[in-house]
Amino acid sequence: MKRKSVMLLAILLIAGALVSAITYQTMQNPDNGNWKGYEKEWAIVDSLEGQGLPASALKAAEAIYVYAKTDKNDEQIVKAIIHKAKYTSMVEENEQIKAIHLFQEEIETSSGVIKSVLQSMTAEIYWNYYTNNRWRFNNRSKTVDFKNEDISTWDVTTLHQKTYDLYVASIANREELKKVKTTRYNEILLKGDEYGQMLRPTMYDFLAHRALDFLMNDEVYITDPAYAFNIDNPVVFGSNKAFAGFVFSAEEVESKKLLALRIFQDLTLAHLYDPYPAALIDVDIKRLNFAKNNTIINNKDSLYLNALIAEEKLYANDSSSTRISFLSLSCPLLQVVVELKR
């Protein structure tokens, strides 16, 4: 089976070759005639990190950030912010809280694609803070000592809601994001192979899938009310065309699960008529797994298996169908049927 390879947001970017002979002195002022271009200046940053000088690397990254701001280079701005957060975590305590403050400040002054990327990254940092400090929240209710600027005083509901809100905000500008190719941001995305790029061709694909990855985590729903939306319509196991065209009632209770389904619909519509179905198949597989794990329909296992079999037949001539075959063959219900026929 062809290994799935997608581009992942680089919170800690991979360091390049070290240039040990270069020092921070040439970086102090990008306008003093010493500016060497982004590639060489980042080599200086990498060199300083390699020499175990995170404080100097931080200052060097800050210099690039200032230059990128003047240059209005969104890609380099985000890359510099990522490195600033990285080196801040090396030289200061409470690194996640510091990183959150850094990203929040940037969100307030940013716009367009760069703002969406920062919102998605900040959401991930919030969620990582929760998972790393889950034990702190186990018995904590809403506290009278709550401070909006101090995440360590938050309760689990507040933290979950903040994470959710940021992921939602990151894809709010979906039409603009759909127009921007992920290849434009190769400096801040870990580049996958050609197949991986087919799965995430636009920044909307990239950010929407990140939001879905969050919404597919069962732990996200522990603070939801008992009257939350339930997935009880078999259309979630239907063909991509049937699912994409289904209209969920406006009277449905707004919930995280309903939002997830609507994101799946939007991604499906975006790729329904692609010349190559790799991105569509990827969305279909993800949607079917989400449906199987979240629906209250009694015969969900058979609906899931039948959906996989239908999908496999539909895309039998495409290499991506091997992923569907693997899932259907590993389906417990199919294994039971095989045993009964023996």
PLM region spans:
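Extracytoplasmic/secretory-pathway proteins
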Residues: 34-342
